[in-house]
């Protein structure tokens, strides 16, 4: 008995392979109960932050991940699944979909951040980390504080002498 590979499935396999190719930040979401407009809104917000969203077939996604030697927890690929990838700041993308979790039926299944598997709780904690801009701003204020304090002290000393 010969096995005939469906050309549509083969095409989906190739598209998914390209979709996650060289991406280290991949998230799996359950979109059950979301309307088309909600899913489109989520997609637009994610794409606005240099991410991408794709509805996938679990079996094909499993084959793609297996070919890429990525071990994923089976619970991530059960039920309706959306895969989200982040090119730059993955925590910004995670914040976007956690904003949707608060107001919709969207559920986070897990994901990979820099190649390491994160369960739902870790992804949620990761989403609360400051962005790159926020971190730079915080670092700059930490560097500025001692200098500002020195200037105020010297000014107060000069005022006392006068």
Curated annotation (Swiss-Prot):
GO cellular component terms attached to this protein's record: large ribosomal subunit
Domain of life assignment: Bacteria
GO molecular function, one term: structural constituent of ribosome
Keyword Ribonucleoprotein carried by entry: yes
GO biological process per UniProt: translation
Keyword rRNA-binding: yes
Entries under InterPro entries matching the protein: Ribosomal_uL10 (IPR001790), Ribosomal_uL10-like_sf (IPR043141), Ribosomal_uL10_bac (IPR022973), Ribosomal_uL10_bac_type (IPR047865), Ribosomal_uL10_CS_bac (IPR002363)
Entry keywords, A to Z: Ribonucleoprotein, Ribosomal protein, RNA-binding, rRNA-binding
HAMAP family: Ribosomal_uL10
Subunit-structure text: Part of the ribosomal stalk of the 50S ribosomal subunit. The N-terminus interacts with L11 and the large rRNA to form the base of the stalk. The C-terminus forms an elongated spine to which L12 dimers bind in a sequential fashion forming a multimeric L10(L12)X complex.
Family to which the UniProt record says this protein belongs: Belongs to the universal ribosomal protein uL10 family.
Described purpose of this protein according to its UniProt entry: Forms part of the ribosomal stalk, playing a central role in the interaction of the ribosome with GTP-bound translation factors.
Name of the protein in question: Large ribosomal subunit protein uL10
């Amino acid at each position: 008995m010969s096995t005939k590979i469906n050309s549509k499935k083969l095409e989906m396999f190739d598209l998914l392979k390209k979709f996650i190719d060289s991406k280290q930040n991949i998230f799996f979401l359950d979109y059950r109960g979301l309307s088309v407009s909600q899913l489109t809104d989520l997609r637009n917000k994610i794409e606005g932050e240099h991410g991408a969203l794709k509805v996938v077939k679990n079996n094909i996604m499993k084959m793609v991940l297996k070919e890429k030697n990525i071990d994923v927890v089976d619970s991530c690929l059960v039920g309706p699944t959306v895969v989200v990838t982040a090119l730059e700041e993955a925590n910004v993308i995670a914040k976007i979909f956690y904003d949707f979790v608060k107001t919709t039926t969207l559920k986070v299944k897990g994901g990979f951040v820099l190649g390491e598997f994160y369960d739902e709780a870790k992804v949620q904690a990761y989403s609360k980390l400051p962005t790159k801009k926020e971190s730079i701003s915080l670092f700059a204020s930490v560097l500025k504080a001692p200098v500002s304090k020195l200037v105020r002290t010297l000014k107060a000393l000069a005022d006392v002498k006068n």
